[in-house]
Structure formats: C-alpha cells, structure tokens
C-alpha cells in the first residue's frame, strides 16, 4: 500500500460513524433522515425492509424498501452520510439470501418475511 493510499484510508476512517447498529437484509429498520425544506431542517422517518447492503468502508450503502399507498418505494442510503441521523432496528428478519431483490415481484402476504427467533 502506498503512502498516498494510507493517508486516504486514515481520512476515511475519521469520517466513519462509530455508533451504527448491526442490521442485515430482511430486517425492518427505521432510518431518521435529515430533510431541508427552505431554510429549516427536520427529521423524516423512513421505515422499511432492508433488501441489500453494500459494504465498502466509507462508501457503504444499504437499500430499504417499503410499500407506500400500494406502491413499492425503494431508497438507498449511504451508511456513513451526514443526512442519516440514526438507524433503528425494529424487527429481525430470517432470510437466506444477501440480496432480497425477489421481493420486488411479490405482493401482499407473499412479500412477508419470517421473524428471526433467537
């Protein structure tokens, strides 16, 4: 590793959030997002099922899917972004795959995820 890469790595490590909860695909999470409307800022809660996680250090991201008024809505969040205020795990899901893209095709009761019991 060159010295330039080490410097970049150190700078990225400083910006990583330390107090993140452990969550995995299939979990139902509530993400508090900072929303700026005009000159005021407020928090908006976005609740849904995590359908994918991308672990890339500072560039880590996760995708949350929810059904809003009968329409599926997916939103991708940068894990270490300043816009993401907090992440709360509401329910642990029991799934066997890392990416739950198949949920896009399912509707109603078929799209439910079993709860992890432990």
From Swiss-Prot:
Q: Which SUPFAM superfamilies match?
A: Translation proteins SH3-like domain
Record's keyword terms, sorted: Ribonucleoprotein, Ribosomal protein
Which Pfam families does this chain map to? Ribosomal_L19 (PF01245)
The terms under GO molecular function for this entry are:
structural constituent of ribosome
Please cite one Gene Ontology biological process associated with this protein.
Answer: translation
Per the record's keyword annotation, is ATP-binding included, yes or no?
Answer: no
Identify the GO cellular component terms for this protein. Answer: cytosolic large ribosomal subunit
Gene3D superfamilies xrefs: 2.30.30.790
UniProt KW Ribosomal protein keyword: yes
InterPro entries to which the protein is assigned, alphabetical? Ribosomal_bL19 (IPR001857), Ribosomal_bL19_CS (IPR018257), Ribosomal_bL19_sf (IPR038657), Translation_prot_SH3-like_sf (IPR008991)
Which family is annotated? Belongs to the bacterial ribosomal protein bL19 family.
Q: Which HAMAP family match?
A: Ribosomal_bL19 (MF_00402)
Described purpose of this protein according to its UniProt entry: This protein is located at the 30S-50S ribosomal subunit interface and may play a role in the structure and function of the aminoacyl-tRNA binding site.
Protein name listed in UniProt: Large ribosomal subunit protein bL19
Q: What is the lineage of its organism?
A: Bacteria, Pseudomonadati, Pseudomonadota, Gammaproteobacteria, Cellvibrionales
State the encoding gene.
Answer: rplS
